[in-house]
């Protein structure tokens, strides 16, 4: 299965009548492996900050997490594995695997829990595949 198929079929899939606003699979260096049409362009320093937060949980909490210059308030994740952010009625979930970052961005009416489920399910699968 191609990386684009993972995005299209597993991240942008319908969940209880709703879809993520955008999604992508990125390398740890920020290289885009696959993305949905509306996925925002990360800046290199944003990826650096996110990766540092995985290595040093809590690193982004004081400043917030920036994605394409949009600021997300960092909320509880799983240290070293999942980071989550909230912005207004939407948010972001990022799951780190051995080689990739699985990213989902949502807006209402999708819930944070639905976004977490979609992103983390694919991320857990990729971890089991050694990716």
Curated annotation (Swiss-Prot):
GO terms for molecular function: actin monomer binding. It is found in: Cytoplasm, Cytoskeleton. Its main location: cytoplasm. Disulfide bonds join 13-115. Keywords: Actin-binding, Allergen, Cytoplasm, Cytoskeleton, Disulfide bond, Phosphoprotein. The modification Phosphothreonine is found at residue 111. InterPro entries: PFN (IPR048278), PFN_euk (IPR005455), PFN_sf (IPR036140), Profilin_CS (IPR027310). CDD domains: PROF. Belongs to the profilin family. Binds to actin and affects the structure of the cytoskeleton. At high concentrations, profilin prevents the polymerization of actin, whereas it enhances it at low concentrations. This is Profilin-9. It comes from Phleum pratense (Common timothy).
